């Protein structure tokens, strides 16, 4: 059974830093009369019955010719199926040992906003051979994302929105963030306003049930990472009788407010950054050693970037303080990236911001040709729809000191959440996640996860009727694949339904 560097399933449900147009505190705003009213899909009112899949060879599956592709039409609104339809893009990776096949396992990589269909192509990397022997892997692009249509489409040039200097330390910088947030929202409404009321987590959870029905299975297994934990827990709460087994890795607290989860994330990233800098100060081989004073050097560098951003290219955003914070956030998802961050910070001290810009680009999934997918746009649209939060600029500003109190270095970057405060679509009605009637659900947390801190993962396990918590001691986001201990516990549960002992800890 293999282990590997885990998948970095970003974005998490709340924003990582303010350069994301500060998505912490997403929710409904003072909404215009034309904004849509959203309700959670009901499981009894909708007469919608999905068609079966017509699987065909894929034209984009790089890893194996066995992967098949299909589509599934689902309604915008399950309570009003005539309102319009999404066409979900779905991939099937058949079990590699048909004689051992148990059934289908749906998988989601996180987000929200990430298309997940590629997990079928890369199943051999993400999952053990025991799992791929026993399960058909079903991976899909949730409504509004990836190759599912229509997809959220807001802007083409991220730099003009996310490269701004942040946190703001002048009225002019603050107004620039507000203006950029409003402009981004306006573009989203202009290009995708028709679908924005219909891409909530609850709607995607209902799509999962439609996919199950289209597969012809009474019960189904599920493996979700990061935000995929919230999606899976929502599905298990709405359709408990259809759950065979479910694993939620890098789990969020599903019933927290966006402010509470934002505070937890700010504290988590602050803690990981402190761990990184302390380790660097103790290790002369660290490229950002600075005579054992990495912490002071980091603070000084960020002040320098605030005063004088580094220009890497005339065609790109300068490396502002906000860009640097994004780069740091990217590296905090796993200590695998820490050596890259060491060099990037050291280079920036010498006036070269290319390394920080590369990490920034990696965070935003910038492609080699300079284009972007729609991940961040869909992330914003889904997050703002899902989470009631600050509904005015003043409310956002008033919350910032609380973020700074729990995270002195990074807190302000989490606190400024203008985009969702200005979002033009009313928030969806949330359901309380309980998993009641779904049976045992395995929840995985790591001790050094900044994006979904262990404290939040514990809350997920506690709020589920039968949540089983597994802990991995590691500095990374998500735990499956880290070592044989966690793989064995998870695989035995999914394959044999052997429920592990809660609070089991796996050490790297």
What are these regions (language model features)?
Residues 40-323, 381-508:
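Gly/Pro-rich cap/lid or specificity-loop segments adjacent to the active site
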Residues 2-15:
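Bacterial N-terminal signal peptides that target proteins for export
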Residues 22-25:
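C-terminal motif of bacterial Sec signal peptides marking the signal peptidase cleavage site
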